[in-house]
Design a protein with these regions (language model features):
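N-terminal amphipathic/basic-hydrophobic helices that include classical n-h-c signal peptides
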Residues: 1-13
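Bacterial N-terminal signal peptides that target proteins for export
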Residues: 11-21
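N-terminal Sec/ER secretory leader and immediately downstream segment
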Residues: 34-136
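Mature extracellular/secreted ectodomains of secretory-pathway proteins
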Residues: 90-220, 238-239
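C-terminal motif of bacterial Sec signal peptides marking the signal peptidase cleavage site
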Residues: 29-32
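Short, low-complexity, Pro/Ser/Thr/Gly-rich segments in the mature regions of secreted, periplasmic
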Residues: 234-250
Length: 250
């Protein structure tokens, strides 16, 4: 009798293991290698699915951090358009919400003809290039967003088989700081800032941008530390003079 129960228990455990492996394979092959970004969805409001069984605690933490990053970027894009209405007029959509939607609510792979298909730090650099005459808010946000998403492996939904590099997350936080410095200091041929963000001289202090960027940096640094601990790989700290700083690899 004991032997029968032992065999039944062994068979049951094997079935559970096979089911778990099937779920992992389903997730792995359904995800493929696509870089396509999906519309935003709050991970705390998702309904239970079979795929949820293949998530660990760290995966849920990653889901939440990515969602927070994209939420902050949406808010930042709206504020920059309000502060720089001339840039909105250069957009094919003379509407803030439509511009935000095409970046964060549509399926795409960050390849926008309007930006000569540039993304990441290349799109950020375009924002501060006199030769570029397009919508600088769009180039800045697409560049920043695609750079940050690349630090998460271009995923918004994580499972046990997914790998995220703490060093890359750390690098992305430093790149945000470099982008912020350029936003506040780089000027065009006429001596004007390429994009206005915080208050100008003789204006009342306006620090909402600093708070948003601070939250973005803190988010990336926090998850970088978490992944450093999980992966047991030390992050190499990098210090640069902002005036001569170069963007770090992602």
């Amino acid at each position: 009798m004991a032997l029968v129960l032992l065999i039944k228990g062994h068979v049951y455990n094997m079935k559970k293991t096979i089911l778990f492996l099937q779920i992992l394979l389903l997730i792995l092959f359904s995800g493929g290698c696509s870089r396509e970004i999906k519309p935003d969805q709050d991970p705390t409001e998702r309904e239970f699915s079979v795929q949820s069984l293949a998530k660990g605690d760290i995966d849920n933490v990653l889901d939440i951090h990515v969602h927070e990053v994209r939420k902050l970027l949406r808010e930042l894009m709206g504020k920059l358009y309000k502060r720089n209405p001339k840039q909105l007029k250069k957009s094919p959509f003379n509407d803030i919400d439509k511009n935000i939607s095409r970046v964060f609510d549509k399926h795409h792979d960050w390849s926008f003809k309007q930006l000569d298909f540039k993304e990441g730090v290349d799109a950020i650099k375009m924002t501060f290039d006199d030769a570029y005459h397009g919508d600088r808010v769009f180039s800045f946000i697409v560049g920043l967003s695609s750079m940050l998403m690349a630090s998460y492996g271009d995923k918004t939904d994580f499972y046990m088989l997914d790998k995220v590099d703490g060093q890359v997350l750390y690098n992305s936080a430093r790149n945000i700081e470099i982008a912020v410095w350029k936003l506040s200091n780089n000027r065009d041929e006429q001596g004007q800032l390429f994009l206005y963000s915080n208050s100008l001289p003789n204006e009342e202090a306006y620090l909402s941008y600093e708070r948003l960027f601070g939250k973005l940096v803190a988010n990336q640094d926090t998850i970088a530390i978490i992944m450093e601990s999980k992966n047991k790989r030390l992050i190499k700290k990098i210090f640069q003079n902002m005036a001569t700083a170069v963007f770090l690899p992602i």
